[in-house]
Structure formats: C-alpha cells, structure tokens
Amino acid sequence: MNYKSKFKVVEFIVRSEKSSEWESIINLISNYFPYEISEKTENYLRVHVLIYGSEDVKIIQTLAKQIYGKVMPFGHVRTVIIEY
C-alpha cells in the first residue's frame, strides 16, 4: 500500500550541565509547536513535537541552533525526525 506521510514527529535530545536552561528551552519550543516532554533530568532533556510541512523543518533547524546556543559549550543537541 502506498501512502504519503502526513506528519512528522521531531525529537529534541539535549544533554547539558546547564539544566537551569531547561525552562527557557521549553519556552522557546512552545513558541512554535505544541510539545511533550518525554524525559527531563538534571543533565538530559527529551522533547517531542509534531510537524506537518517542509516549512516546519526549517523552523526545527533554526530551533536546534538556538537551543545549542543556550547549552554550549557544556552540552549538545540532537534532532531526530520520524516520518509517519
């Protein structure tokens, strides 16, 4: 059966020693997309968002850069896009 992907789930995985930035990172994401926090610890944050188009992918790329700016040089950001 052929079908076209209608939405994508994006997973932001953030590791950092600066957990004080978690709330500002979540606020940044919430300005653009509804989100769900999958895991939040002192050094690790995993957030999922739902996107629908290629314009959203560009926003995700920009968000990843902004999040990295908040956690560098003590952490890193990984973004995974899962198509459905």
Spans of features found by a protein language model:
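Short glycine-/aliphatic-rich beta-strand segments at the starts of folded cytosolic domains
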Residues: 2-16
